[in-house]
């Protein structure tokens, strides 16, 4: 359902509708309607198709946005909030969410990069925390475990990362503030 409302889909549909209206108007000899709608419709349609071909949908959000709003606003760090905001939106022209971050951490494979499958918010001892599930791609699980200490520091001062092995090629990364 969320694929239906991506910006690429909306532009494609809008451009197609304008093009069809312009074509029908042209066929019925209504030049005042046909020219503008065709001239605007075709570029919008092509732009929508271009966006559609390069879009990366947001990962599944396992917890409703409203569920941890109060905890997020009171104890969430600005880095956690920025990370959440960054991954729950549509991306264009990238192979994976957090592409530049994973490249900087040397957790990237150009052919088959790690893919963020889902993100969840949770309460960790009264503190706001994020849990991300990655499909590892061709990056060995051992590389992730070697970088566990660096992961927390990379995403923000005072954050710690906890890694849990999931089933098959999945890895669960928890970013949280240490409990006092």
Q: Whereabouts are the PLM-identified features?
A:
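Short, surface-exposed ligand-recognition loops at beta-strand->loop->(often short) alpha-helix junctions
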Residues: 89-96, 136-142
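Cytosolic juxtamembrane regulatory segments of multi-pass membrane proteins
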Residues: 71-88
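An N-terminal amphipathic alpha-helical segment
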Residues: 56-74, 92-128
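N-terminal low-complexity, charged segments
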Residues: 82, 108, 116, 136-137, ...
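N-terminal alpha-helical membrane-insertion module
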Residues: 1-69
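Short low-complexity stretches enriched in small and charged residues
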Residues: 83-92, 127-132
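Cytosol-/stroma-facing membrane-proximal "stalk/adaptor" domains immediately downstream
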Residues: 122-180
């Amino acid at each position: 359902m969320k694929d239906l409302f991506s910006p690429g889909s909306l532009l494609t549909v809008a451009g197609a509708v304008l093009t069809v209206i312009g074509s029908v108007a042209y066929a019925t000899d209504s030049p005042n309607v046909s020219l503008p709608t065709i001239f605007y419709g075709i570029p919008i349609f092509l732009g929508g198709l271009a966006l559609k071909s390069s879009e990366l949908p947001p990962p599944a959000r396992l917890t409703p946005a409203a569920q941890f709003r109060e905890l997020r606003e009171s104890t969430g760090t600005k880095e956690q909030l920025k990370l959440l905001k960054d991954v729950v939106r549509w991306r264009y022209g990238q192979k994976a969410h957090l592409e530049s971050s994973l490249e900087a951490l040397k957790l990237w494979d150009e052919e088959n990069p790690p893919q963020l499958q889902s993100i969840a918010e949770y309460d960790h001892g009264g503190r706001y925390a994020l849990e991300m599930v990655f499909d590892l791609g061709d990056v060995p699980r051992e590389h992730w475990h070697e970088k566990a200490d660096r992961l927390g520091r990379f995403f923000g001062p005072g954050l710690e990362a906890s890694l849990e092995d999931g089933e098959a090629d999945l890895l669960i990364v928890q970013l949280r503030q240490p409990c006092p």
